Amino acid sequence: MSGRIFRGAGACVQGKARHHAGQHRGEETVQEQTLDIATKDGVMETFICHPERGGPYPVVFLLMDAPGIREELRDMARRLGTVGYYVLLPNLYYRAGRDTIYGPDVLQHGSAEHARMRAVRTKMTIPPVMEDIGAMLRFVDGQAAAKPGPVGAHGYCMSGPYALAAAARYPDRVAAAASFYGTWLVNNEAEESPHRSFDRVKGELYIACAEHDDLAPLPMVEELRGLFERAGSPGQVELYPTVHHGFAFPQRWCYDKPAAERHWERLIALYRRRLG
């Protein structure tokens, strides 16, 4: 199927289909492409992968962290693709320019790349991202390889709140949402803080927090847990002991393999329960 053109509503091909073999027994070879998805504000380049054969497959949105799209995230999308999901990894920074990416020192405070990323990141509020989620929902509804019906969404760092917000904004479509070391999930000064919408969620939520995280300090985690329980939200808030913000990223200094593998186990189990 190399070179096959996918054309859905509002989409155009940006490259030939490629294939990526699964790394473990029972995993599928995935087909991958980068497509443009039409949004209210332009076109959003989106990495898409799914098993090469069979289908249709349940849909999952993998929402990027602040440093943006990179091969590390594509590999994470591929891992989900090899176990049977139709995965979309959108460049949420598309409003700042096509193929907006940052150099290796993007996480170094005081660097030019960090400043450039922050200038874009601070404009990434929940409402426009929810419009992007809506655009992706419309797109997958026109794709033969994408299973109709409920979808999943998960995010890391800045996108943890986006995934939870998506479950509240689209409660009849987003059946599972997960946040991994999501930032400021409780912000009492922000009207759009994710904790305010727990009661609108119909799907299952999973919220994983790192013990050492300046962007989600322990008092906030405890407050979040209490709010979550009082709202009667289906799901779980889990604290990962000893690890730091970013623990699931293999190329990050704080990568912790046992915690990262637990995050995969929790995420895939969530999607199996809710999406199949």
Task: Please provide the spans of the model-predicted regions.
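N-terminal cap/leader regions of alpha/beta-hydrolase-fold enzymes
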Residues: 5-13, 19-276
